[in-house]
Structure formats: C-alpha cells, structure tokens
Amino acid sequence: MGSGVRVRVIVKGIVQGVGFRSFIRRHATALGLTGYVRNLPDGESVEIVVSGPEDRVNELIKLAKRGPPAAVVDSVEVEPYEGVEDFTGFSVRYD
C-alpha cells in the first residue's frame, strides 16, 4: 500500500482517556491504513499519522471529527506528513 497520501492530524478537545486512540486504531485497521495514533503531552490533543489511499484517509478523518461516544472534538487540523518512516500496520504509540 505504498501509493496514496500521508497526513498528520491533530485532534483537540476531550480526546484523552475516552477511548479515542483505540477507536482510531480499530477504524484505521478496518480501512487498511497504516500509521499511528498517540496522545500529546498537552493533555487535550491526539496526533494521528496515517498513510493510505486518499478516500480511505479522508474517511478516517471524518471518523476522527466524530470520535467515540465519550469524546468531545473541538478541532481537527490536517497537514501533509513529510516523515520518511515506513509503517507496517496501524498502532497506538505511548511515547
């Protein structure tokens, strides 16, 4: 799945401690996307780095805007991801 787009998505709001990362991982895996999701140290943001076909990446972004039931998403920022890392699946990172 080397073709497609790579983006970095920052989701802000009540998105930590509400199952947001698991929600994103589950949907990204179902969509066949690669990358990762992690909490950011500010306590109110989650970073998603995702790679795959544009239509599937856009579907994940739509899902991120909604989030799981306990989440309250205030904003979603999307930018191109310029990293060189090759992803072999979609994971939750704890760094």
UniProtKB/Swiss-Prot annotation:
The keyword Hydrolase applies. Keywords: Hydrolase. It comes from the Archaea. PROSITE patterns: ACYLPHOSPHATASE_1, ACYLPHOSPHATASE_3. Residues 6-94 form the Acylphosphatase-like domain. The keyword Hydrolase applies. InterPro entries: Acylphosphatase (IPR020456), Acylphosphatase-like_dom (IPR001792), Acylphosphatase-like_dom_sf (IPR036046), Acylphosphatase_CS (IPR017968). The active site is at residues 21, 39. It catalyses: an acyl phosphate + H2O = a carboxylate + phosphate + H(+). Transmembrane segments: none annotated. It is an enzyme of class 3 (hydrolase). GO terms for molecular function: acylphosphatase activity. Its EC number is 3.6.1.7. Belongs to the acylphosphatase family. This is Acylphosphatase. It comes from Caldivirga maquilingensis (strain ATCC 700844 / DSM 13496 / JCM 10307 / IC-167).
